[in-house]
Amino acid sequence: MSGFMLDTDISSYIIKRRPATLVAKFKQNAETLSVSVMTAAELRFGAEKAGRPGLTELVEEYLERINILDWTSEVTVPYGRIRAELERAGKPMGSMDLLIASHAVSQGMTLVTNNLKHFSNVPGLKVEVWS
């Protein structure tokens, strides 16, 4: 599979701010866009935690319009390799970011983020910044 996997940071940015350039890019690439089920979980948690009226509905509307990829056992192969390499290099990564990055690698997808710093050390991960 190829295409773009949007991480939690860029997804949250799109949901909350709806910047015209990103909305246009979203529509232009709609067939090739996905999020990891881990991103869906983080977005739903964030909306519940914030308790802001209407945010949960915005998150659900976003998730209805994008393909949500399940995390399967095939993701455990790149996860194990990437985590071990990063820890050996003294560059550990946050758990959810590592799960999402591993998911993108396993699918051969480019990860789209606003936070290049979090993902720049992941071996084998293609990353783009759209903001």
Where are each of the predicted segments found?
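Alpha-helix capping/helix-boundary segments
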Residues: 10-11, 75, 100, 117-118
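Histidine- and aromatic-rich ligand-binding microenvironments
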Residues: 7, 36, 93-94, 115-116
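Active-site neighborhoods of divalent-metal-dependent phosphate/nucleic-acid chemistry enzymes
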Residues: 67-112
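Generic structural signal for small/hydrophobic residues in well-ordered secondary structure
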Residues: 7-8, 43, 79, 104, ...
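Acidic, PIN/NYN-like endoribonuclease modules and their adjacent C-terminal/linker elements
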Residues: 1-3, 101, 105-131
